Amino acid sequence: MVEDKIRLLIVEGRSHSGISDELLRGATQAIEARGADYDVITVSNALQIPTVIAMAEDAGHRPVGVRYDGYVALGVVIRGETYHFELVANETARGLQDLGVAKRLPIGFGVLAVDEEAQALSRARVSEGDRGGAAAKACLETIGLKRQLLGQAR
């Protein structure tokens, strides 16, 4: 039996362009190195990512929808002077974890929650932390485990 080619959806919260570019570059390089296909949906902030992944997963079960094997969540949340940072960072992580567990979705977590922009850049750069690439690799690994443990492709 020939295994289907892996197809991922990257959902990126693009609130900090330079950092987002690096996260996306790392993720796409890792996916392409594996020979997988991917689509990208861009939203304005990290808090939207779990909702969009849930909608994409639901759409994939309709006749006209695209079925994805897994998802890569990319975004940046930088601490400010208010409680907003904690709300966005914590609820984004919680929403993604809830989706992954409840629906058994492979989701690579590449949402950076940092104190300052310099920290985000060093973690996002492909030549340094490559958190985008790490998120994509984690998703691909989880897809392999899902296929092994549950015998499921899409």
From Swiss-Prot:
UniProt KW Cell wall biogenesis/degradation keyword: no
Annotated positions binding 5-amino-6-(D-ribitylamino)uracil: 46-48, 76-78, 109
GO cellular component: cytosol; riboflavin synthase complex
Enzyme Commission number(s) of this protein: 2.5.1.78
Annotated GO biological process: riboflavin biosynthetic process
Residues that hold (2S)-2-hydroxy-3-oxobutyl phosphate according to the record: 81-82, 123
Pfam families the UniProt entry points to: DMRL_synthase
Keyword Transferase attributed: yes
Described purpose of this protein according to its UniProt entry: Catalyzes the formation of 6,7-dimethyl-8-ribityllumazine by condensation of 5-amino-6-(D-ribitylamino)uracil with 3,4-dihydroxy-2-butanone 4-phosphate. This is the penultimate step in the biosynthesis of riboflavin.
Protein name, entry field: 6,7-dimethyl-8-ribityllumazine synthase 2
Gene: ribH2
